[in-house]
Swiss-Prot record:
InterPro entries: Beta-tubulin_BS (IPR013838), Beta_tubulin (IPR002453), Tub_FtsZ_C (IPR008280), Tubulin (IPR000217), Tubulin/FtsZ-like_C (IPR037103), Tubulin/FtsZ_2-layer-sand-dom (IPR018316), Tubulin/FtsZ_GTPase_sf (IPR036525), Tubulin_C (IPR023123). GTP binds at residues 11, 69, 138, 142-144, 205, 227. This is Tubulin beta chain. It is found in: Cytoplasm, Cytoskeleton. GO terms for cellular component: cytoplasm; microtubule. Dimer of alpha and beta chains. A typical microtubule is a hollow water-filled tube with an outer diameter of 25 nm and an inner diameter of 15 nM. Alpha-beta heterodimers associate head-to-tail to form protofilaments running lengthwise along the microtubule wall with the beta-tubulin subunit facing the microtubule plus end conferring a structural polarity. Microtubules usually have 13 protofilaments but different protofilament numbers can be found in some organisms and specialized cells. Gene3D superfamilies: Helix hairpin bin, Tubulin/FtsZ, C-terminal domain, Tubulin/FtsZ, GTPase domain. Tubulin is the major constituent of microtubules, a cylinder consisting of laterally associated linear protofilaments composed of alpha- and beta-tubulin heterodimers. Microtubules grow by the addition of GTP-tubulin dimers to the microtubule end, where a stabilizing cap forms. Below the cap, tubulin dimers are in GDP-bound state, owing to GTPase activity of alpha-tubulin. One of its GO terms (molecular function) is GTP binding.
Length: 445
């Protein structure tokens, strides 16, 4: 089997990770103690991708949980699926990173990183044919951002030919910000992700808040509500990896379909229909409605309008009892209507996959992954906040005090600016110039 080792770091990573495991355990018929009580063969067919079968037919997640303080670990352990995880795979200390990227990456985090890599190595040895890693972290704090990116670079060194997918809560949002230095942390992290990640699924806290308040009509959304949305999207994105199917059935195939140039691997993700925690969708949803919602900014987990950019590639995963013909017809219709928003120099740049198992509580759903040049807005937003503070060297002493150099900040800033320019360049590219570069890259692969 093609296994995936999952890591979750920091408070945000561990809370979203716990919600993710609860969601996919339910879909595979695994209870809180790790025993299978489902009724469908399809649930077991690719169970080994995320779960390791231990003694007495108990299924244990291939998960490593990391934090620099014990609080979140304790709450994951005490949660409904806390007994699911291997106790040795909880790796934490008491120090904390104090929301400082430098502490997570260079001082506190670097003291713990070897211990984490040992656990990762043990998990990798339990795999028959490891396809890669996925890591969940936020980019605004200290542990998820600083130590998360350190782990990614260490895993890259140790397993250079395996895939690396990250689910990153990318954008610091004023609505949910709990620290002033988030723009620094996010920019320094993105600098690392551009080089070391193969595919990054971008999640924007502000978009999650808007969905909770406008679409789900929750007056005071909690982190639990936000995590529910993220776990629904993650479950959708990983559907092709966990259930039998042809399209994007492993991380490498997903990257080949979605990443036209190595640095442009930041994806926008969305989900339909959106429902709040514990609420089931009583309304009948149709395929035309799901395809329509794919191109609705209100269903995206990034606060961006795709109409400000162009799609390089896109992928849609439909779940439930849906007709392949109806899906393909609807996808073609929507594409024809919106053809100006797709670059014309990548032919057949929209892929569709079907899975017969719907998410819990829904008859039908669609998840969409889009590599759009509109994502540059997100980097610009963080870059502007970064520049405003860095120009005055505000809060810099918290980073230089941990041994960082100002040069690193300058490099991270220019790397982010380069990324924005690259997205803009391919947005403006015409069919002749774009095609040449695309085919050069395809041959190189």
């Amino acid at each position: 089997m093609r296994e995936i080792v999952h890591l979750q770091t920091g408070q945000c990573g561990n809370q979203i990770g716990a919600a993710f495991w609860q969601t996919i355990s339910g879909e595979h018929g695994v209870d809180g103690a790790g025993y299978y009580n489902g009724s469908l063969d399809i649930q077991l067919e690719r169970m080994n991708v995320y779960f390791n079968e231990a003694a007495e037919k108990k299924y244990v997640p291939r998960a490593v949980l990391v934090d620099l303080e014990p609080g979140t670990m304790d709450s994951v352990r005490a949660g409904p699926f806390g007994q699911l995880f291997r106790p040795d795979n909880f790796v934490f200390v008491q120090s904390g990173a104090g929301n400082t990227w430098a502490k997570g990456h260079y001082t506190e985090g670097s003291e713990l990183v070897d211990q984490v890599i040992d656990v990762v190595r043990r998990e990798a040895e339990r795999c028959d044919c490891l396809q890669g890693f996925q890591i969940i972290h936020s980019l605004g704090g200290g542990t998820g951002a600083g130590m998360g990116t350190l782990l990614i670079s260490k895993i890259r060194e140790e397993f250079p030919d395996r895939m690396m997918a990250t689910f990153s809560s990318v954008v610091p949002s004023p609505k949910v910000s709990d620290t002033v230095v988030e723009p620094y942390n996010a920019t320094l992290s993105n600098h690392q992700l551009v080089e070391n990640s193969d595919e990054t699924f971008c999640i924007d806290n502000e978009a999650l808040y808007d969905i909770c308040m406008r679409t789900l009509k929750l007056s005071e959304p909690s982190y639990g509500d936000l995590n529910h949305l993220v776990s629904a999207v993650m479950s959708g994105v990983t559907t092709c990896l966990r259930f039998p199917g042809q399209l994007n059935s492993d991380l490498r195939k997903l990257a080949v379909n979605m990443v036209p140039f190595p640095r442009l691997h930041f994806f926008m993700v969305g989900f339909a229909p959106l429902t709040s925690r514990g609420a089931y969708s009583f309304r009948v949803v149709t395929v035309p409605e799901l395809t329509q919602k794919m191109y609705d900014p209100k269903n995206m987990m990034c606060l961006l309008d795709f109409r400000n950019g162009r799609y390089l590639t896109a992928s849609a995963i439909f779940r439930g009892k849906v007709s392949m013909k109806e899906v393909e017809d609807q996808m073609r219709n929507v594409q024809n209507k919106n053809h100006t928003y797709f670059v014309e120099w990548i032919p057949n740049n929209v892929q569709t996959a079907l899975c017969s198992i719907p998410p819990r509580g829904l008859k039908m759903s669609s998840t969409f992954v889009e590599n759009s040049t509109a994502i540059q807005e997100l980097f610009k937003r963080v870059g502007d906040q970064f520049t405003a503070m860095f120009r005055r060297k505000a809060f810099l002493h918290w980073y230089t005090g941990e041994g960082m150099d100002e040069m690193e900040f300058t490099e991270a800033e220019s790397n982010m600016n380069d990324l924005v320019s690259e997205y803009q360049q391919y947005q403006d590219a015409s069919i002749s110039e774009g095609e040449d570069e695309y085919f050069d890259y395809a041959w190189a692969m």
